[in-house]
């Protein structure tokens, strides 16, 4: 009874939910900046931030700390936070739209399209003169957008209203086909396999501010589009017919949500590789803590996902120093048992996911 009462209080206190979410993200960012092969004391972290923002004197060690923080750790932490937020909010939106608790950002196959773009770039050693070092993420984003267009076109071709089942099956077909294409390239790669495998397992290392700047427009556009559709997502979870009766332009809103979620997913995969379980588990945890209202579920999922991926990246580079593990390994090792516990908890409580 007490647990149920506590859960109801958490769900009804939205201010507390956002305070917890922002606090979790802030603590994760500070830890992500402070911890590493060279430990930066937390007071020094705040001094450097203060100096960057307002000027003033700094300690004798702070110039070194400033260089490490601003050029290495902070862009890495910011990119991890943005990718985690993007995957989580896209996962929450797809689970609501498709009415499928097992849906995640990769359901529609857009991530496979982004992966094909990256793998082909690595396999052929492409380096376009106009975009230089941005060749891989730019071509990956382009492949993701092309895949999204193909999935939506095929879904509409099969079923004019793009039913949920049609979208899911189209995603399965796309994932299978593009996954086979990736496997073919891997089989043909030979001894130069490591860069492709490392990219596919996900990482935010050695990215820098340029990757943050490249990803940020897609993140802002996709996130804003999803959040402004929170009320419509609430209505559409009860069925498209009821949503139409309540005045929701179902096809227009569905297309907007699909495009926004696909933009977030494709661009996230383009800059970080494939990172599993974030977009599947984080929305379930958020829903369990603070309810199913998408007006709050979406931004709260983004906050928790951002903090989670920052901590996962921290573990990936510190748990077996000096070896740095791909971040996708950490998220899968952490996400799989957590999702299993959520599943057991829900079924013991007599509720479905």
From Swiss-Prot:
What GO annotations for molecular function exist for this entry?
A: transmembrane transporter activity
Query: What are the protein's UniProt keywords?
Result: Cell membrane, Membrane, Transmembrane, Transmembrane helix, Transport
> What is one GO biological process annotated to this record?
siderophore-dependent iron import into cell
Q: Does the keyword Protein biosynthesis apply?
A: no
What is the superkingdom listed in this entry's lineage? Bacteria
Family designation: Belongs to the binding-protein-dependent transport system permease family. FecCD subfamily.
Q: Known PANTHER family for this protein?
A: ABC TRANSPORTER PERMEASE PROTEIN MJ0876-RELATED, FERRIC ENTEROBACTIN TRANSPORT SYSTEM PERMEASE PROTEIN
Q: Protein name, please?
A: Uncharacterized ABC transporter permease protein YvrB
């Amino acid at each position: 009874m007490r647990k149920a009462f506590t859960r109801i209080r958490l769900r009804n206190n939205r201010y507390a939910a956002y305070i917890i979410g922002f606090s979790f993200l802030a603590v994760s960012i500070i830890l992500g900046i402070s911890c590493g092969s060279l430990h930066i004391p937390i007071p020094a972290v705040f001094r450097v931030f203060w100096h960057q923002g307002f000027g003033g004197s700094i300690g004798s060690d702070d110039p070194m700390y400033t260089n490490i923080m601003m050029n290495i750790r902070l862009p890495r932490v910011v990119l991890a936070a943005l990718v985690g937020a993007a995957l989580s909010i896209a996962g929450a939106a797809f689970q609501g739209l498709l009415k499928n608790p097992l849906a995640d950002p990769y359901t529609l196959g857009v991530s496979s399209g982004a992966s094909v773009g990256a793998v082909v770039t690595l396999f052929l050693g492409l380096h376009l003169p106009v975009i230089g070092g941005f060749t891989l993420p730019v071509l990956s984003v382009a492949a993701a957008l092309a895949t999204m267009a193909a999935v939506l076109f095929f879904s509409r071709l099969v079923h004019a209203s793009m039913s949920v089942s049609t979208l899911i099956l189209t995603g399965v077909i796309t994932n299978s086909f593009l996954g086979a294409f990736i496997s073919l390239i891997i089989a043909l790669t030979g001894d130069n396999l490591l860069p492709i495998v490392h990219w596919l397992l996900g990482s935010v290392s050695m990215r820098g501010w340029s990757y943050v700047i490249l990803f940020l427009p897609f993140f802002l556009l996709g996130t804003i589009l999803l959040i402004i559709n929170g009320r419509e997502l609430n209505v559409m979870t009860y069925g498209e017919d009821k949503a139409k009766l309540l005045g929701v332009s179902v096809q227009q809103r569905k297309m907007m949500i699909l495009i926004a979620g696909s933009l977030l997913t494709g661009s996230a995969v383009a800059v970080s590789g494939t990172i599993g379980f974030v977009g599947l588990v984080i929305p379930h945890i958020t829903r369990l803590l603070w309810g199913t209202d998408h007006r709050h579920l979406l931004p709260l999922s983004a906050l928790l996902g951002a903090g989670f991926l920052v901590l996962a990246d921290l573990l990936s580079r510190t748990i077996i120093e000096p070896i740095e593990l791909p971040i996708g390994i950490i998220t899968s090792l952490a996400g799989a048992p957590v999702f299993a516990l959520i599943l057991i908890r829900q079924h013991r409580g007599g509720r479905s996911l």
